[in-house]
Amino acid sequence: MSEHTTTRGASDATIRAYDAADFDALVGLIGAAFGGETPDSVRFAVSAPNTTTFVAQRDDRVVGVSMAISFGASAWIGNVVVAADSRRRGLGQALTEVAVAAARGRADSVLLLALGDARRIYSRLGFEDEGLYGTWQATDATAARIEPAGALDEGRRIVATSAAPDLAEHAVALDRWATGEDRRAYLELFAPSMKVALARGDDGAETVAGYRTRKPWGTGAVVARDAATARVLLCDLLREAPGTRFEFPDANERGVRLATELGLERFKENMRMRLGRPVAGFTPQAVFKALSPAVG
């Protein structure tokens, strides 16, 4: 296990690879920082085969974490957290540097979603702004604006992959078209619980026009080729999970209009930032909900 000793002012910490004994500390750190995280979600994050996790340890205590998630030609930096009493000592930057070094060994493009003051750290490391992601949540007006099941189809129907497993492969292909990334390693783990939107053409043939994922601990991505498909998927999701928060690019103007029509309110924003080459083929207009803040 490689170790990197980092000194920042009065802060001496060892940054090393994650060990299973660190799990409870990570649940506490990540949960306190982001809220809504569960042991299941953290367990998935640290055990995913394409993820490298680092922790910062001072004495016998884990005081920080960072992750590098690889999707081949692209990679994401996620879950960068430092304990409250260890901040403003350079440890967040050190954790990010280690994760970036791991990611750049495999990827041409390294991406992340930065919140607030963290953007300054990433800018110092060479990351460039690519565009804001707004986070939206339901209001008191939302329930009345969600169409009942079956009331809104517009030539579309939703099919669960549990009933039609072959559709999951089409959803993975659609995700690659939308994101420009090969996220199969993550999506295949959620394949049995996907829902796919099929659109009927003038000739009567159906094609995959969108999908949404459901993770064991909560909701996941919503990707759609058009606003009508997105509306069907979002209404279906909000009927199932009314408290869902939607994080998607501001560049998706159709998504902004749809969220507003559904009575959602934008209450937070993150900046998508990039180190290295732009992701060829990224289509923000097709992303109506990010898979997670850690991987966009």
What is each PLM-predicted segment?
Residues 82, 88-101, 227-239:
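Conserved acetyl-CoA-binding loop-helix of GNAT-fold acetyltransferases
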